A protein has these predicted regions:
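Eukaryote-biased RCC1-like beta-propeller repeat architecture
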Residues: 1-300
Length: 300
């Protein structure tokens, strides 16, 4: 919670604000976006920098060590450094998975740190990043998603508990969507259950997800569940498609069969989510076993 203790929020009502510290210009840091994983939280700050706190056993806080931050006094505020992303520039999108953190930067690159299992960091290996100072700063590694692509949004997820793995998806200026990492449950949308975790599978060899003939429409937003592995893409015309795990009907297509794990499940074969009266989807949020959509009418 970033409040300098492990006392549950029910004992601290009203909940105290998280101290983000002081900006170098003398004013307070403010958050423009926040994202939470299983046991860590990150804030995108008003200058494009990032601060994270919580569990850090895989380096997901990006501080070059594996110590928990935020459970003791004097660890937050000015005591918590911004993550050293070297010369990457401002972050424009923040994706926090089960045990990973990803950022898309103003130059279109993506970097992820934390758990590498499954290949969700996009580096062509499954080693953890962020647990050592040599992983950050000038040595920050960037995901290999292909040439002539510039990311505008990144989302991170994966599965928790037994069989834990990592998944990352990105939306590009071309409106293409690519996913990499653990392929279980079809969350990569590639028509198989294979992990994407080697150099040979990344870069230009990584194909965009086939969403079928969208009639000139295109994805404008993404959401991924951080603990079970399903992904949803919202189109500019308000329609939405989801794929991956579907054990509780979270894909919104009227059954509990996963999608994306077999060759005939994507493209034209992947149905659109049926909303109330086919209302326009404005925003989507995914949880472990459910999906929620804010519709243009204001209904959720």
């Amino acid at each position: 919670l970033g409040i300098g203790s492990t006392i549950g929020p029910q004992y601290l009502l009203p909940a105290p604000p998280v101290p983000l510290g002081t900006h170098p210009d003398g004013g307070p840091y403010t958050a423009t976006a926040i994202a939470a994983g299983s046991y860590h939280t990150c804030a995108l700050l008003n200058d494009g920098k990032i601060k994270c706190w919580g569990h850090n056993n895989y380096g997901q806080l990006g501080q070059g060590h594996s110590n928990t931050i935020g459970d003791q006094a004097l660890e937050m505020g000015d005591s918590l450094p911004v993550i050293d992303t070297g010369g990457a520039g401002r972050a424009v999108s923040l994706g926090v998975g089960t045990y990973t953190t990803c950022a898309a930067f103003v130059d279109g690159r993506i970097s992820c740190w934390g758990m590498g299992l499954g290949g969700g960091l996009g580096l062509g290996h499954t080693s953890n990043r962020g647990t050592d100072a040599s992983h950050m700063g000038a040595d920050l590694a960037f995901a290999e998603f292909g040439t002539d692509l510039s990311a505008v949004k990144v989302v991170a997820g994966g599965r928790g508990g037994v069989g834990v793995g990592t998944v990352t998806c990105a939306l590009f200026t071309t409106h293409a969507v690519k996913c990499w990492g653990e392929g279980a449950d079809g969350s990569l949308g590639r028509g198989d259950l294979t992990d994407i975790d080697t150099p040979e599978e990344l870069g230009d060899n990584l194909d965009p997800i086939d969403l079928g003939d969208l009639g000139g429409s295109y994805p404008v937003d993404l959401s991924i569940s951080f603990a079970s592995g399903h992904v949803c893409a919202v189109l500019n015309d308000g329609r939405m498609k989801c794929w991956g795990s579907n054990s509780h009907g979270q894909l919104g297509i009227g059954d509990t069969q996963r999608r994306g794990g077999a060759a005939d499940e994507m493209g034209e074969s992947l149905p659109f989510v049926q909303t109330i009266a086919n209302d326009f989807v404005v925003q989507v949020a995914t949880t472990t076993t459910s999906t929620c959509a804010l519709l243009a009418s204001g209904v959720v």
